[in-house]
């Protein structure tokens, strides 16, 4: 039996495996590697409307490179020193053999303009920084001293573990936002806090829905640490760790168990039904972040939010038309936007649950997490949020070089390192705490 290769996600030709984070043929992989290594800048003469398919001769390099980024190819995965050696070898060959004059540039396509000006720069930047955040997460949430290079079976966690995960996420997600949106850093401190406290909780729930899409499951809530909350067995979440004299574990399950069904009905099922992908997830996150009409929001912040919303909507429409080539992009975008009101219902339910637990002392909630959920942040949040790692963890991180990141402890850019991301594991049938769909 002959098994056909997966098609190239850029041009549709027979694929040659995963290259730089996406399925690609050898030609597209070589094109992307050389473009990044030589820092090429292309401009499309057709305003970014070119078709990128295997049967098109002389494909537009600007649109081809834009599509490479859109399908998930990462510039940080290109090892530039290999191209440097290749260039040296080429120069040596050309000097020794004057009959050979390889072309290292394409004058018709070179321009001071960058491909991002006609493509989807913000969504691509969000995607790249999100991948880096996922790398950092593997270290930050490695509290058990496990080898981060070995695949770890996820487990159902209790509320204390989930809250600890989310506390660490506050700084990580803030760093992701600051790196992805230069405009955000220009805002006044109070406006940053206003937008972020309105964003973090919806993002936390949205990401659960996105992870459910990736794993095609809605019976569990995936956490950034890789563990999960079993929606069908809320007793594993509350269990016997409820120490309040006001409520028993069984009463806690009866009181808060229905919330899981609300999350599933309003967020998980709709997102899985629409099969929301990474760029659509980033679009939803951006629309939630750049909200308007918030109490205390300045006119400058409102205008900045509007500009960023319009930019994101233009980019996702470009993504639908030029990358995914959807026949009716407007309808697809409308179905995506319909998810936002349902998301807000889940957010309100979560806030109500946390408020009840805090007022009646049902179970302990960290003050920082409670303040964020209830819409309050300390004045020095963006200066004092700390992400601590041990000396051993810092050594482990330094494996393969990638882009620098913002260190919230030092308040400056520092070098970060990346290592191969293992496939996400989900609970198996052998796990007695697992509930299959």
Curated annotation (Swiss-Prot):
Q: Where is the NR LBD domain?
A: 115-376
GO CC: one term? Answer: nucleus
What SMART domains does the database record attribute to this sequence? HOLI (SM00430), ZnF_C4 (SM00399)
Where in or outside the cell is it found? Nucleus
Entry keyword set: DNA-binding, Metal-binding, Nucleus, Receptor, Transcription, Transcription regulation, Zinc, Zinc-finger
> What is the stated purpose of this protein?
Orphan nuclear receptor.
Kindly report the protein's main subcellular placement as a broad class.
nucleus
- What is the source species? Caenorhabditis elegans
State the encoding gene: nhr-28
Q: Which family does it belong to?
A: Belongs to the nuclear hormone receptor family.
Tissue specificity comment: Expressed in the pharynx, intestine and hypodermis.
CDD domains per UniProt: NR_DBD_HNF4A, NR_LBD
The record places the DNA-binding region at 5-80
GO molecular function terms listed in the Swiss-Prot or TrEMBL record: DNA-binding transcription factor activity; RNA polymerase II cis-regulatory region sequence-specific DNA binding; zinc ion binding
What is the designated name of this protein?
Nuclear hormone receptor family member nhr-28
Q: Which terms does the UniProt entry file under GO BP?
A: regulation of DNA-templated transcription; regulation of transcription by RNA polymerase II
Highest taxon listed in the record's lineage: Eukaryota
Q: NR C4-type zinc fingers: which residues?
A: 8-28, 44-68
């Amino acid at each position: 039996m002959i098994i056909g290769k997966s098609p190239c996600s850029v041009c549709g030709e027979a694929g040659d495996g995963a290259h730089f984070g996406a399925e690609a043929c050898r030609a597209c992989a070589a094109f992307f590697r050389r473009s990044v290594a030589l820092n090429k800048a292309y401009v499309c003469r057709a305003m970014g409307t070119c078709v990128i398919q295997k049967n098109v001769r002389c494909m537009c390099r600007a649109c081809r490179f834009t599509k490479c980024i859109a399908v998930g190819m990462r510039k940080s995965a290109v090892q530039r020193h290999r191209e440097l050696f290749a260039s040296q070898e080429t120069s040596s060959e050309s000097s020794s053999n004057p009959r050979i004059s390889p072309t290292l540039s394409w004058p018709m396509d070179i321009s001071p303009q960058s491909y991002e000006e006609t493509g989807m720069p913000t969504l691509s930047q969000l995607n790249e920084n999100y991948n880096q955040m996922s790398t950092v997460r593997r270290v930050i949430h490695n509290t058990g001293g496990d080898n981060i290079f070995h695949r770890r079976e996820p487990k159902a966690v209790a509320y204390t573990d989930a809250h600890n995960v989310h506390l660490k996420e506050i700084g990580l997600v803030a760093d992701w936002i600051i790196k992805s949106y230069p405009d955000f850093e220009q805002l006044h401190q109070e406006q940053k806090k206003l937008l972020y406290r309105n964003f973090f909780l919806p993002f936390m729930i949205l990401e659960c829905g996105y992870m459910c899409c990736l794993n095609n499951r809605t019976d569990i809530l995936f956490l950034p640490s890789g563990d999960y909350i079993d929606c069908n067995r809320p007793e594993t979440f509350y269990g016997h760790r409820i120490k309040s004299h006001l409520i028993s574990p069984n009463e806690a399950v009866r009181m808060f168990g229905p919330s899981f069904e609300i999350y599933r009905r309003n967020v998980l099922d709709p997102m899985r039904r629409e099969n929301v992908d990474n760029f659509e997830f980033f679009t939803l996150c951006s629309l939630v972040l750049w909200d308007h009409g918030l109490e205390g929001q300045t006119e400058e912040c409102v205008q900045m939010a509007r500009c960023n919303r319009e930019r994101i909507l233009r980019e996702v429409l470009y993504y639908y038309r030029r990358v995914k080539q959807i026949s009716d992009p407007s309808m697809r975008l409308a179905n995506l936007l319909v998810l936002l009101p349902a998301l807000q219902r889940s957010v309100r339910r979560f806030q109500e649950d946390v408020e009840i637990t805090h007022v009646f002392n049902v179970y302990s909630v960290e003050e920082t997490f409670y303040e964020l959920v209830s819409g309050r942040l300390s004045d020095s949040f963006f200066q004092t949020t700390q992400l601590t790692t041990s000396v051993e963890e810092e050594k482990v991180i330094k494996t393969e070089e990638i882009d620098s990141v913002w260190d919230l402890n030092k308040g400056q850019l520092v070098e970060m390192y990346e290592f191969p991301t293992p496939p996400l594991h989900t609970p198996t049938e052998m796990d007695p705490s697992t509930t299959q769909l």
